[in-house]
């Protein structure tokens, strides 16, 4: 129960032997927020906000079922960021983290609505291309991804050249 739209209150009522009752109100706002946060972290990467490996696994299972039922096609692009370790080693993890956020934004600007980008961890990303109409479409997307990630990034005044390996 929410009294003011901001706090969550749990109400419990116990009947007493004499016919009366005891009502207990407990503010569970923080507990509910913590549970929601844990549920979110179980499915999304904290750094980039992208779906994580668990969420990806759920989605690909759904997509494979659709493929079986309808005969659709899907394509999977496994992306490994080249030279990411040297970015972390030379510029530090905070810059590396910002670079990963920029990589995820750049990937997001390329894929179509309905496709899924997930971060598997470290410098590994996966794109689930949900409806390539022809095999050439998946190859075309892979080339666009490689080309986009070859363009240098500017992170806090640092020009960062990376690349990507896609399989």
Which stretches of residues belong to each language-model region?
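Per-ARNT-Sim (PAS) sensory domains and their PAS-associated C-terminal
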Residues: 1-9, 19, 158-160
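PAS-family sensory domains
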Residues: 4, 11-14, 24, 165-167
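Output-coupling edge of small sensory domains
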Residues: 13-16, 151
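Sensory coupling linkers of modular signal transduction proteins
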Residues: 16-42
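Short loop/turn elements that form and flank the Walker-type P-loop nucleotide-binding site
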Residues: 18-19, 71-72, 162-163
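Conserved long alpha-helical elements within nucleotide-processing catalytic cores of c-di-GMP signaling
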Residues: 39-43, 49-76, 82-112, 118-127, ...
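Catalytic core regions of nucleotide second-messenger enzymes
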Residues: 118-119, 135-136, 149-165
């Amino acid at each position: 129960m929410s009294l003011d739209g901001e706090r969550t209150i749990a109400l419990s009522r116990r009947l007493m032997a004499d016919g009366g009752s005891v009502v207990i109100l407990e503010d569970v706002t923080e507990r509910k927020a913590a549970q929601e946060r844990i549920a979110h972290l179980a499915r999304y990467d904290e750094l980039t906000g992208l779906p994580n490996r668990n969420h990806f696994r759920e989605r690909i299972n759904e997509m494979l079922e659709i493929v079986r039922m309808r005969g659709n096609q899907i394509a999977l692009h496994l992306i490994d960021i080249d030279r990411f370790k040297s970015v972390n080693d030379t510029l530090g993890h905070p810059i590396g983290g910002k670079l990963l956020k920029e990589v995820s934004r750049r990937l997001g600007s390329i894929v179509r609505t309905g496709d899924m980008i997930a971060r598997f961890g470290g410098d590994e990303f996966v794109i689930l291309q949900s409806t390539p109409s022809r095999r050439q479409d998946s190859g075309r997307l892979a080339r666009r991804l490689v080309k986009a990630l070859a363009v240098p990034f500017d992170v806090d005044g640092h020009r960062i050249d990376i690349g990507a390996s896609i399989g």
